[in-house]
Amino acid sequence: MMTMWCLTLFVLWMLRVVGMHVLRYGYTGIFDDTSHMTLTVVGIFDGQHFFTYHVNSSDKASSRANGTISWMANVSAAYPTYLDGERAKGDLIFNQTEQNLLELEIALGYRSQSVLTWTHECNTTENGSFVAGYEGFGWDGETLMELKDNLTLWTGPNYEISWLKQNKTYIDGKIKNISEGDTTIQRNYLKGNCTQWSVIYSGFQPPVTHPVVKGGVRNQNDNRAEAFCTSYGFFPGEINITFIHYGDKVPEDSEPQCNPLLPTLDGTFHQGCYVAIFCNQNYTCRVTHGNWTVEIPISVTSPDDSSSGEVPDHPTANKRYNTMTISSVLLALLLCALLFAFLHYFTTLKQYLRNLAFAWRYRKVRSS
């Protein structure tokens, strides 16, 4: 048992080192108050939302499938029937989802809303080898059944939740009725088609790009301030931003607050974090992206601290000072040039007059 545990940890560590791709599709079917159903399919690859399908039962003909990120244009160019095929597949799933929603609403009852979710995911290495897969179905925000680990056995939900416990017989019956053939189909999809498309997508997505990091201080007041650190233009989207104070992470009561990870149109991500700190202390922002790490020093000086003799940074004053400095240097150079020209002219004139006087004396001597 211990050997298997150590082997599992080793495999996970190796995947961390060599890299792993994650392809996930999420399906959400919702019945509204008018008994109209909408189905939305979202495709996510390595944390990037790359595909969306949407349809409403009131207008099935308007179903649409779209790539939602720049590199999907290259996928569509390489596979011209890709979006049409995804739309046709979404239309087929819509009919199945509508039937499942009706059955679940009758069996489990209408609660706050009628929402059926379905998720499947495959994890692959950089060279395209299958690592792990997952299949799961949920109702109103709770998991009903899952296929994971070795992908051979479906498991049920957490029956500690009251309404799930009340419907345990129905849910267990649904799981028991899943045939081995259906399980094999799902397993083959995760190990086959899902893995193959993960390899295809990896060939079109942007290469690994490390972030541009900017850090500083804002909202400075008395002896408190906020240190911020923002990372721009990185891919993939997994990043860790921390603040270091005297070699240690900031205390737990000053845990950094991070804004949501946001994608950009070029396929990269950006994220910013900030933390409340004390003035007159030095901090460091440490950003880790994969095996790449950078540290940005952040120094905070109290606005009331005049003992240092430093003038507070003021952009307008600095600009005026820089302009005056440049003007002074140019004026000094001009004066030096004029002085040099005057000395040169004076020396030349003096030499000319001396030669003229010598020539006059020589002429006078000869005439005598």
UniProtKB/Swiss-Prot annotation:
Signal peptide range: 1-18
Record membrane topology: Single-pass membrane protein
Residues the record marks as carrying a glycan: 56, 66, 74, 95, 123, 127, 150, 167, 177, 193, 240, 282, 291
Keywords, alphabetical: Glycoprotein, Host membrane, Host-virus interaction, Immunity, Membrane, MHC I, Modulation of host NK-cell activity by virus, Signal, Transmembrane, Transmembrane helix, Viral immunoevasion
Annotated region (Alpha-1-like), positions in chain: 19-114
Chain spans, region Alpha-2-like: 115-208
Sequence segments annotated as region (Alpha-3-like): 209-303
Location(s), subcellular: Host membrane
PANTHER family assigned: MHC CLASS I-RELATED, SHKT DOMAIN-CONTAINING PROTEIN
Protein name per the record: Glycoprotein UL18
Organism whose genome encodes this protein: Human cytomegalovirus (strain AD169)
Taxon lineage: Viruses, Duplodnaviria, Heunggongvirae, Peploviricota, Herviviricetes
Gene that produces this protein: H301
